Regions:
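"A position-specific structural signal for the A-helix of alpha-solenoid helical repeats
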Residues: 4, 34, 68, 96, ...
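Short coil turns that delineate tetratricopeptide repeat
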Residues: 26, 60, 89, 123, ...
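Alpha-helical adaptor scaffolds
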Residues: 33, 37-40, 67, 71-74, ...
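N-terminal and secondary-structure boundary signal
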Residues: 205-434
């Protein structure tokens, strides 16, 4: 009965109620995962750990709960996370095991060996589909080996995790072969996505291509002083509170802005590809979402990736609201209005995106589920905090802030995306009045 009520609440989008009930009746991988997430949201990590260990003992084949259990192990004893995936069952678990060894236990050689094993079993016919880890393995192996053959194959996939450093490395190969037109085209594409990026600009100037492509670069609308905080690779095991406390001590008058994706990662709500599948409804609605539109067509414009995002919308907002949003979209098109779908499904679902930083390029990242509670904990020592969603193309959006933050001023101060992009590893920016 509890499970049935939880499922009904989930269908209508009463997510927090559903999570509490799923924790009491974890009868499926989905229910157990969301139940554990709900416990973690409430600060009950020990209860979440107990729930995940119990379902793991009965249902070792459940993939979502297994990866969430690994998250909790990483925060306590990373070696247990490795043991959880030893031996790995299938290609995705080989990727996960390699990531755990390489990024968390710093046993780089062992991690690379597992990536190579997974690479040898790759199905290249479906390499552009989201649930094929080809793009992830190529990115990892290119970074650690600098193999030009692998890098060229990675570039040919035309994937959205081919980022600034990858572009610069590939352009170097093209230039060394005298293929300057292709090198220029690749950099041009990079500038479309990362406008004004210093890494790409330096490469462009070094090759003597003249004026940088004139894609409109957003500028800050204030005279605020911005200080980028280099954090290195933040992980689900990072202590964000101590980082915020240190930054606040160094800049007591500034507003500490944190990327919303970082908040979601710390909440544990990452949706790992390879652990779940899109539903029939998600596959049906996916091709109509228009994901991936733009000047350049990348693999993520394929309906397959869109279906995964719609599945995330369904899980976060509920089937009812997604159907209602789809109806609102049809009505909006008749009335020549845009944005009605996201107005219905809400900001948490709207924020869903695929991460590009290893090892989180294997995830869909929703908006923070309980951002008000999260920033209240981070601000316990007096820091003024804003959670933001900023990129080069669309500018800045303020998700929420602690009391006393002028959000309009802050939004204008961040319009030019001073944090940069993935390879910059500066997801925290302190903004101070002039």
């Amino acid at each position: 009965m509890i499970y049935a009520i939880a499922s009904l609440c989930d269908w209508f989008g009463a997510k927090h109620v559903a999570m509490r009930l799923f924790a009491a009746a974890p009868r499926s991988d989905y229910a157990a995962w969301w139940g554990a997430v709900g416990l973690m949201q409430s600060g009950k990590d020990e209860e979440a750990l107990g729930l995940l260990m119990r379902v793991r003992a009965v249902h070792p084949e459940w993939k979502r709960t297994k990866r969430l259990l690994a998250t909790l192990y990483l925060r306590r004893d990373p070696e247990k996370a490795v043991q959880l995936y030893s031996p790995p069952m299938g290609i995705w678990e080989e990727v996960f095991l390699g990531d755990l060894l390489y990024f968390f236990l710093h046993r780089e050689n062992e991690g690379v060996q597992w990536w190579r094993k997974a690479y040898e079993r790759m199905d290249w016919k479906s390499a552009r589909e989201l649930d094929n880890p080809a793009r992830l393995l190529l990115k990892r192996l290119c970074r650690v080996t600098s193999d030009p053959v692998l890098l060229e194959r990675f570039a040919e996939l035309d994937t959205d995790n081919f980022r600034q450093q990858d572009i610069v490395n590939y352009v170097g190969i093209l230039a060394s072969r005298g293929e300057m037109d292709k090198a220029r085209e690749m950099l041009d594409r990079g500038f479309y996505l990362y406008r004004g990026d210093p890494m790409l600009t330096a490469c462009w100037e070094r090759l003597g291509f003249g004026q940088v492509p004139p894609y409109k670069v957003k500028t800050s609308g204030t005279a605020a002083i911005r200080h980028n905080v280099y954090t290195g690779l933040l992980t689900e095991a990072s202590d964000l509170s101590s980082i915020v406390d240190r930054v606040h001590q160094e800049h007591p008058t500034g507003v500490v802005t944190i990327a919303s994706s970082v908040m979601s990662m710390c909440e544990g709500t990452l949706m790992w590809v390879g652990t779940f599948k899109p539903s029939r409804l998600a596959r049906f609605l996916g091709p109509y979402t228009g994901h991936g539109g733009g000047k350049f067509i990348h693999w993520y414009s394929y309906p397959m990736e869109a279906a995964w995002k719609v599945q995330a919308y369904i899980e976060l907002a509920g089937t009812f609201r997604v159907l209602l949003g789809a109806g609102a979209t049809v009505l909006g098109k008749l009335l020549h209005r845009k944005g009605w779908f996201y107005a219905v499904v809400g900001p948490v679902a709207k924020a869903v995106d695929s991460d590009k930083v290893m090892p989180y390029d294997a995830c869909l990242v929703p908006g923070p589920l309980d951002v008000e509670t999260s920033i209240a904990i981070l601000a316990r020592k007096g820091a003024r905090i804003s959670v933001v969603d900023v990129n080069d193309v669309f500018g800045a959006e303020i998700v929420t802030s602690t009391e006393g933050v002028d959000e309009d001023w802050l939004r204008r101060s961040l319009e030019d995306n001073p944090a940069g992009n993935d390879d910059s590893m500066t997801p925290i920016v302190v903004v101070m009045p002039e």
